[in-house]
């Protein structure tokens, strides 16, 4: 285990299952309040107005942020279940904080910060918690992300398209605290773990945040962050090109790639073929 609090929570859960531990009304009331606030935020908040950088989006690909600022009308709407997914994340955070409290883990609850980049450049955000003097974030993850992405800091760095690392570093800098890590909860199994990020080069990350801020503030021309990749089947190229995983999650992929066709795989032999974002289909595959 990467953090002493992991053992505390696991020990509490084991005792609770054995009938040897319980949760106080004060803690259940706090969890209920947090869930209620999440429902109010998700359903009753006013739509965001003009684009601005926030700690929650500053680490996303710059090409995506460029569209958010300059071409928001071409955004593909999120499906209705996206709201449910956001709610699940809020509920997981509220319950996990309740478990920390029930386990006797002391922490400072969420707070607002302003990251000062100098020259009157600021980005606002809200961190999840401060534990042992370090800023931590709570993430709910799919089973795949839990097992393949949130393995350690290095694996996350290789595919951080949602900007979790800049987000955490920005929170820590804005709060004038050290970088902690992520409490990651598997939405499929209930497993949880701590992914330590204390070894991150914060100055390098902050420089990247500043570069992103300047790129958008100076109205730089659009530039893709990723290129299409060759499709392979049994290690052989098919002649088709498809989007990267990062582009596949982007709400502007159809605007960015006019030839995009999101269709079942043209080469898979499976009964239920995976859906692929093709941007070029070879004639022989058409």
Question: Where are these predicted regions, by residue range?
Answer:
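Metal-dependent nuclease catalytic cores that hydrolyze phosphodiester bonds in DNA/RNA
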Residues: 1-135, 142-153, 286
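Metal-dependent nuclease catalytic regions and adjoining charged, substrate-binding loops involved
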Residues: 22-25, 158, 170, 174-286
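Structured loops at beta-to-helix junctions and adjacent beta-edge loops in soluble globular domains
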Residues: 68-69, 139, 185, 253
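Short, well-structured alpha-helical interface segments that form or flank functional binding sites
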Residues: 91, 95, 124, 163-170, ...
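A structural signal for short, well-ordered beta-strand segments and their strand-loop junctions
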Residues: 130, 134-138, 179-184
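A short acidic, glycine-rich active-site loop
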Residues: 153-165
């Amino acid at each position: 285990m990467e953090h002493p609090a992991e053992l505390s929570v696991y020990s509490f859960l084991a005792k609770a299952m054995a009938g040897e531990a319980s949760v106080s009304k004060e803690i259940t009331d706090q969890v209920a309040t947090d869930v209620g606030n999440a429902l109010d935020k998700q359903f009753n908040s006013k739509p965001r107005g003009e684009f601005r950088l926030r700690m929650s989006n500053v680490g996303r690909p710059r090409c995506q942020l460029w569209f958010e600022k300059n071409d928001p009308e071409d955004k593909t709407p999120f499906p209705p279940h996206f709201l449910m997914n956001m709610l699940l994340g809020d509920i997981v955070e509220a319950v996990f904080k309740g478990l920390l409290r029930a386990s006797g883990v002391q922490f400072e609850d969420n707070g607002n910060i302003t990251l000062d980049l100098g020259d009157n450049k600021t980005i606002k955000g809200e961190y999840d918690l401060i534990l042992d003097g370090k800023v931590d974030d709570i993430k709910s993850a799919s089973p795949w992300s839990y097992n393949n992405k949130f393995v350690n800091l290095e694996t996350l760095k290789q595919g951080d398209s949602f900007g979790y690392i800049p987000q955490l570093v920005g929170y820590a800098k804005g709060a004038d605290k050290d970088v902690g890590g992520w409490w990651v909860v598997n939405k499929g199994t209930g497993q949880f773990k701590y992914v330590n990020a204390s070894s991150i080069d914060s100055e390098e990350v902050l420089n990247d945040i500043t570069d992103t801020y300047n790129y958008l503030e100076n109205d730089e021309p659009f530039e893709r962050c990723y290129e299409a990749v060759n499709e392979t089947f049994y290690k052989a190229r098919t002649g088709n090109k498809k989007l990267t995983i990062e582009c596949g999650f982007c709400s502007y992929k159809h605007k960015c790639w006019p030839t995009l066709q999101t269709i079942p795989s043209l080469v898979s032999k499976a009964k239920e073929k995976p859906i692929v974002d093709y941007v070029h289909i070879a004639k022989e595959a058409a």
